[in-house]
Every structure is written in C-alpha cells, then in structure tokens.
C-alpha cells in the first residue's frame, strides 16, 4: 500500500477501473426506484473554470448518494452547442462554427473527466448534431400543427453587434443584450413566435406544485407571467367609428380619466392624428423607433409624449378627452393603449404635470377631501367621489360595479391579462436550428415533411460581420420545390432561438440514441420528471419557464404523462475569485501579473482595486479545474467546492482553504492506513451487549455522524455541514483509545462510506486497502442504530442564580428528583450553596439545574 496520499496516482487508476466496470452506466433494472440527477448542460465556450464545475460536483454528490441509498440513477451530460459565439468565432478566426464548437466540447470534456463525475457518457448529446436537431425541428412541426407556432410582423429587439433579434427576456434592465452587451434597437421584421401565452395561466398556477423549488425562482416566474385582473374598456373616438381599447386593473378610477395614450406604433395613431400635428407626431414616432423597449419603459427615465390632436369620449362621463402618444406605451403589451388617471397613478401624475393635463380626484381615503389639490398620486383603495352614481362606494366594490355597468352598456367587460408575451424565436444567424418551413407563392408557409427532416445546415456558407442571415445568401440551399404543389419556393432562412434546444434536452436523455422517434414515451415517462435539477439562478425565467412550457405542450400532444419537468431545483451560488481592476481605466488585470501584497498596474504602476467577483474570462480571474486537480487531486477540489459555503450561497475561492481540505484527506489516509496495517484484513463483529463505556461513546459518535450527515444530505443538501460531520468523526476516531476494538473498525468503514459521495477516489482506494474486493461505490449507505445514539450519561449544567458555574455527568434518563439530588451533592453546587438556604430549584430535565439562593 502506498505510504502517503498520492491523488495523482490513485485517481486515474480508479477512474479507469470504474469505466472498465461500467459503474457509471444507467441501470436497466426497473425494480429499483429511479432518481434522475441533472446539471444544466453547458455551452461549449472553450474552457471551464471551477465556477462552472461547482454545479457538476453538486449533482454528482447527489447521484452517488442516491446509488448508495438503493436507487437506479440517471446522470447524463450534453452540450448546449448552438449559439452566436461560435458564429462570431468563425468570422474572427476563419474557421467553421462546427469545428470551433466540437473542439471546445472535446476540451471541456477533457477538463470534466478528471473530476471523477459519475456521468453516463453513453447518453451524451450535442444540440448542434443533426441527430438531435432533427427532433427539435420535429417538435416545431408539432407546435405548428397545434396552432402554437405562427409568423407576424413585429417590432423586435435588434442587437446591432450580433446582428440578430432578441427575445424580451434576453434584454437586461439597462436595455442591453444579455450576450453582447450592446444597446438594443427596435426594428420591424416578420418573425416566428410560439404561443406561450396560451399556457400563461397553467404556468402560473402550477408554480404551486413546485414545492421543491426555491421561492425566489417561483416569485421571479410569477412576476414575469404577470397576471392582472381588471377590465377591458373602450373609448369612442370623436368623428370616427373606431374606439380606443384599454386594459386597466383600476376600473374604479374611470371617472378620473382625463386623457388616453396610444403607443406610437398603434394602427390608430395615424388615423387620430390631426393635420396640424402630423409633422410633429411623425418626428416623435421616428425618434421613439430608435429606442429599445427597455429604454422606453425604464422607471427612472422621463416619459415623453405628444398630443395627436385627436379626441376620445370617456363613456362614463360623456366628456371629450385628448388622445396622446407616448414612448412608455408599447403596442405589443396589452391593447397598445392606456387610460390616463393622473390623480391615482404615479406615472400618469408625473406625465400630467409635465404636460399640463387635468388631474381629477375620484378616490379619497376615508375622511379625505376631494377638493384639495394633490401633491402626489393617491394610489391606495378608498371611497369613490366625483364618480356619479358610484359616489360613496368603497373602491374595491366600485370596481365590480363599474365593470357591470360597462358590460350592460357595451362599453367593456371583465378581463384577465398577462405580462407574458408570445415567445419570439426567429434569429437571423447561421449557427442554430433551421426552421423547417418552405415559403411557396401559391401555398404560403408549408411545413417541411417529417420524412425530409432534418433540414441540415449547409457547410459552404460565407460568414460576415455585415449582418443578415448567412443562409439567406446561399441560393443553392434557399431555392427548393414546394412540397405541396411543386412550384418554385424558398426555405425559411431564420434559425431558432437556442433556448428552444434547451427546452427539451432533458426529455431526450432517457432515450438519447433513438433514431426513429423524438424519444420512447415509455422510457421518458419512466425517468421523468427530473428528481434533482442543478443550475444557476440566472436561468430562473428563460430556460426554466420555457422548459415548463415545452413539457406541457408535449403532454398535450400525448407524448408525456406529467405536468412539470423538474421536481426539485437547486440554484447554486457563484464562485468568486480575487479580482484586480484599474479604477482609472476600468481595465481588469490578471492576478498572475499582480503582486498580491502591493497590487499595482504592471504597465502604469497605478494602484489597483482588489475585490471578489464572479469568475469569468473577461475579468481574468477564472481558476481552471486542472490547476487544482494537478496539485491536490479531484477529491480535494470536490471537497473544497462543497465545504466552503452552502450550495445556494456564493463561494469565495481561496487557495489556503483548498490546502485545508487536502490536509483533511491526508489525515483520513493516515488514519485508515494505520488501521489497515493493524487489522490485516481481519473482521470483527460488534457485540453491542459487551461494549465498554469508551466503546459506547465512540459508537455513539459514529452513529451521530451517520444521522447528521444523512439529514444534511436529505432535502436541502447542506454539503458544508455534512463535510463538517465527517471531520468530527475523523477527529473522534483519531482521539479514540479503542483502536483495536470492532467499534473502531466500524467507525473507519463508516467514515469511508460517508465520504464516498464527496471524495470517491480516496474512499475506493482505502476501502480496497481494508481488504474489500467489491467497489465501495456499490455499498449501501450506512444506517443509524437508534440505540447507539442513546447516551449512558449526559452533561448537566449547574447554575447558581441563572449563572453557569460548571457541569457534571449524570445517568441519562434521570428523574427530576434525581437530577436535583445529584446537582445538590456535586462539588460545583456545594461551593455556592453550602450553608445557605436554597429558596428555589429550577430543573430542566436533560439540560440544567438552577439554584436560587439569597445574595
């Protein structure tokens, strides 16, 4: 046996052995309960840092634990391989996106394998493979057949750097692209959409089923879906047969409407605009058209508007009110128009003051005054005033009364509205899934026949930074015959949003190599839903919402028999590293070029800011996993990742802390190696009836470790405290004087079994050194002996006047009377109560005895 711990020797040895034995393969035995453990698959960007690997290690610990607990486990891996970076690399480096992508996949797989992840690589998928995207296209055709995919002209978010369209969810709060960081522009294009709004209510209500999800994620999704209950009201336009339709959650304020606002893009805008205002309105529309949606709706940005010269009639008051257009109203949202109630809406109040529009109070707090000019909008419920027949009604009741009158008079009706918009999936780039549609002058948009799938990406494409779809420029690929009538037709040249690929990949893994169907429903229904999903909080809305949507659609297509894809979700925190930045230039400096004791810019000598920030290439602070595994081994890297912080919290990467985990594993190595040398393979059964006091204490420590570790790993996965329990058990064994006892042998084996999910290589090596011929990976998770947890003695705290003065050992299970007697007779108590009158004794069984004596 190796006399010292040498991870660089034992880890490759056991990884090769496990691969040869096929221990990571997914079992076909359906007699065991299933457990599907899944990490969000990565985009193959080129290289990994330990921030990326944290979630794979977390998932692997769970997968290994569940195998030991008797489950058949599926833990697959794949690549979210389409996307703009590959195409941009093709432009910059003159290589094909496929070549760049597959090289990155190979590099990242090479980085992952030394970590000892128990991944079933036989199920590996890549979304850029025609074998996979054939079925992505097939799914799109199902959406098309169900009326859930459609085309329409739309004002879209245009990324001027990546030269493509972005979904609303891909634009941040500052109006910038989620990927390139470019300021997003508005552009009118004919686009493909998926009708996610058809599932808005179910996506919202089914959040209640997700008891294993963080509340934060569910709240983010609920807010994104944004259900509003209110009224649809119509305001007739003066001199026209048309009406301005609005949605409001405050129909009780309708008597306070003093203007209505249209989106500049609203089709009624040119109709209601007067000749006198046309020039100014056209100029305003042109200026607004250059702004992104986020710019237009930002709360901290002043709202701009202009009167059209048109008038509408408030049907409840009969009064004429002006029609304006404003930048903050978007045609894609709601009806594309809003009613202005400045007295009771903060934004309307500011807009009305800015543009000298009337402010009419129609809701007041109880005892309030409707005549006093408002200094700010009153937005709370109250009593209706200046509201005709509804005066004096509580506003909550008034809402229903107003809706009832609107329905009776034909002015409107009750309505539920959602913030969620249909999902725009068109992208004007090459490296994505071609949309399987052919445009025929006779037949319109014709789906590609299923027999002709996949519509493969052509390889002879020229890549340019000039924008537009590269596919559209390749006539040999674009020009085809219509599948219906045979006429000359053209392929759809847009590709799909890459979030389509990741919206169903988890359904493919149970049947990853099926070339006859998207998957065998029996296999997928057996393994799904995913029991534990692990990934970043940044995917709370996009990926997780879209995956839920796809699952529900495919259920309705009779392909699945479940409603939700992921039972439990763990959103791991970020891994942060020491980061250096020049505050004058804003440039980040690689730590390797900085003296940590005196951080200065190596070129200018300027002092640098030093702080912890999320690992990323742009900040030069990423630590590649091999930097750790080459020096300390995978088990140390895994333990540090798990021990430093709870999984949902951010983790600060510190080299000294990594060293601490390496020292712990060295202690385990020495402890087990010394025992193996003494035991020489001999086995001795623990005789619980004949244990000495110290053996009982040691056995209690062993079973406390089993209990605490099991509880830490059951539910919330508190890996950090579980590792702490292993350290406590290691210390108890090291301190024990019973090293020849069968109890000590039980403790050593228990330590290795509990350590296995965290540090499988060292556990396997030491298990073999103890004389075992079968892999520790196939052993059963230790079970708690409840009897062992019961102590013969407990520690009793002695207090005098509420102040702790010492402790004594007393028999467990002692009565209150016995505890008081033992405490009175103890040396600790006698020092304070001897010769004094004890006025009162407070006994807390199992914890303390407190004596109250005169001062």
UniProtKB/Swiss-Prot annotation:
GO terms for molecular function: aminoacyl-tRNA deacylase activity; ATP binding; leucine-tRNA ligase activity. One of its GO terms (biological process) is leucyl-tRNA aminoacylation. It catalyses: tRNA(Leu) + L-leucine + ATP = L-leucyl-tRNA(Leu) + AMP + diphosphate. SUPFAM superfamilies: Anticodon-binding domain of a subclass of class I aminoacyl-tRNA synthetases, Nucleotidylyl transferase, ValRS/IleRS/LeuRS editing domain. It is found in: Cytoplasm. Keywords: Aminoacyl-tRNA synthetase, ATP-binding, Cytoplasm, Ligase, Nucleotide-binding, Protein biosynthesis. A motif ('KMSKS' region) lies at residues 614-618. Residues 293-303 have a biased composition (Basic and acidic residues). Its EC number is 6.1.1.4. It holds the Pfam family tRNA-synt_1g. The keyword Membrane does not apply. This is Leucine--tRNA ligase. The gene is leuS.
């Amino acid at each position: 046996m190796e006399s010292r711990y040498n991870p660089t020797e034992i880890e490759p040895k056991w990884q090769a052995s496990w691969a040869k034995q096929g221990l990571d393969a997914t079992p076909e035995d359906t007699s065991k309960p299933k457990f599907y453990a899944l990490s969000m698959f990565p985009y193959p960007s080129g290289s990994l840092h330990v921030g990326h690997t944290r979630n794979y290690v977390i998932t692997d610990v769970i997968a290994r634990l569940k195998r030991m607990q008797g489950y058949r486990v599926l833990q697959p891996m794949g690549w979210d391989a389409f996307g703009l970076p590959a195409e941009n690399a093709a432009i910059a480096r003159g290589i094909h996106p496929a070549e760049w992508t597959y090289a990155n996949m190979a590099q990242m797989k090479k980085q992952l394998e030394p970590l000892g992840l128990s991944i079933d690589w036989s199920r590996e998928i890549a979304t850029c493979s025609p074998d996979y995207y054939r079925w992505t296209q097939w799914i799109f055709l199902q959406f098309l057949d169900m009326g859930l995919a459609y085309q329409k002209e739309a004002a879209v978010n245009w990324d001027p750097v990546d030269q493509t369209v972005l979904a609303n969810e891909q634009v941040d709060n500052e109006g910038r692209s989620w990927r390139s960081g470019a300021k997003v522009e508005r552009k009118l294009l004919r686009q493909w959409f998926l009708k996610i709004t058809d599932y808005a209510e179910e996506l919202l209500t089914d959040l209640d089923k997700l008891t294993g999800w963080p509340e934060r994620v569910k709240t983010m999704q609920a807010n994104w879906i944004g259900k509003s209950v209110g009224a649809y009201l119509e305001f007739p336009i003066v001199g026209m047969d048309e009406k301005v339709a609005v949605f409001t959650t405050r129909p009780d304020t309708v008597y306070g409407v003093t203007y209505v606002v249209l989106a500049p893009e609203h089709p009624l805008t040119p109709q209601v605009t007067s000749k006198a205002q046309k020039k100014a309105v056209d100029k305003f529309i042109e200026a607004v058209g250059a702004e992104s949606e986020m710019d237009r709706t930002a709360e901290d940005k002043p709202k701009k508007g202009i009167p059209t010269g048109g008038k509408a009639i408030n049907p409840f008051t009969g009064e004429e009110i002006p029609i304006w257009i404003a930048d903050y109203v978007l045609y894609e949202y709601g009806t594309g128009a809003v009613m202005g109630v400045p007295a009771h809406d903060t934004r309307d109040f500011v807009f009305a003051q800015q543009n000298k529009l009337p402010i009419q109070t129609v809701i007041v707090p109880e005892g309030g005054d409707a005549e006093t000019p408002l200094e700010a909008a009153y937005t709370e419920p109250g009593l209706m005033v200046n509201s005709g027949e509804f005066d004096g009604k509580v506003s909550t009741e008034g809402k229903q009364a107003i809706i009832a009158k609107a329905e009776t008079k034909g002015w409107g009706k009750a309505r539920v509205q959602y913030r969620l918009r249909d999902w725009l999936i068109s992208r004007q780039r090459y490296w994505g899934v071609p949309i399987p549609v052919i445009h025929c002058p006779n037949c319109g948009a014709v789906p590609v026949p299923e027999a002709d799938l996949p519509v493969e990406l052509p390889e002879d494409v020229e890549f340019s930074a000039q924008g537009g779809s590269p596919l559209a420029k390749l006539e040999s690929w674009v020009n085809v015959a219509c599948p219906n009538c045979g006429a000359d037709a053209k392929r759809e040249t847009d590709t799909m949003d890459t979030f389509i690929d990741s919206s169903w990949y988890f359904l493919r893994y149970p049947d990853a190599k099926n070339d006859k169907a998207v998957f065998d429903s029996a296999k997928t229904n057996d393994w799904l839903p995913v029991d534990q999903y692990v990934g970043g909080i940044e995917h709370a809305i996009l990926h997780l919402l879209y995956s839920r949507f796809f699952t529900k659609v495919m259920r309705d297509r009779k392909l699945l028999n479940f409603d939700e894809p992921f039972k439990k979700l763990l959103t791991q925190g970020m891994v942060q590293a020491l980061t250096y930045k020049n505050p004058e230039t804003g440039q980040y400096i690689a730590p390797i070029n900085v003296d940590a004791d005196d951080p200065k810019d190596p070129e200018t000598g300027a002092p640098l800011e030093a702080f912890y920030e999320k690992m990323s290439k742009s900040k030069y602070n990423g630590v590649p996993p091999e930097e750790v595994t080459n020096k300390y081994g995978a088990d140390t890297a895994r333990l540090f990742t798990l021990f430093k912080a709870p999984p949902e919290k951010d983790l600060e990467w510190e080299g000294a802390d990594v060293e601490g985990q390496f020292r712990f594993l060295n202690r385990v190595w020495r402890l087990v190696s010394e025992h193996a040398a003494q035991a020489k393979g001999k086995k001795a059964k623990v005789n619980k009836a004949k244990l000495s006091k110290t053996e009982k204490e040691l056995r209690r420590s062993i079973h406390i470790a089993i209990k605490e570790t099991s509880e830490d790993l059951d539910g919330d996965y508190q890996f950090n405290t579980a590792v702490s329990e292993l350290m406590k058990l290691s210390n108890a064994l090291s301190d024990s004087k019973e090293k020849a006892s069968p109890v000590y042998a039980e403790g050593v084996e228990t330590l290795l079994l509990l350590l296995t999910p965290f540090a499988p290589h060292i556990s396997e090596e030491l298990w073999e050194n103890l004389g075992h011929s079968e892999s520790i990976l196939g052993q059963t998770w230790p079970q708690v002996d409840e009897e062992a947890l019961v102590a013969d003695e407990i520690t009793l705290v002695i207090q005098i006047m509420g102040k702790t003065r010492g402790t004594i050992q007393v028999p467990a299970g002692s009565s209150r009377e016995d505890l008081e007697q033992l405490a009175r007779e103890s040396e600790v108590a006698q020092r304070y109560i001897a010769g004094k009158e004890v006025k009162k004794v407070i006994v807390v069984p199992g914890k303390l005895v407190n004596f109250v004596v005169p001062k």
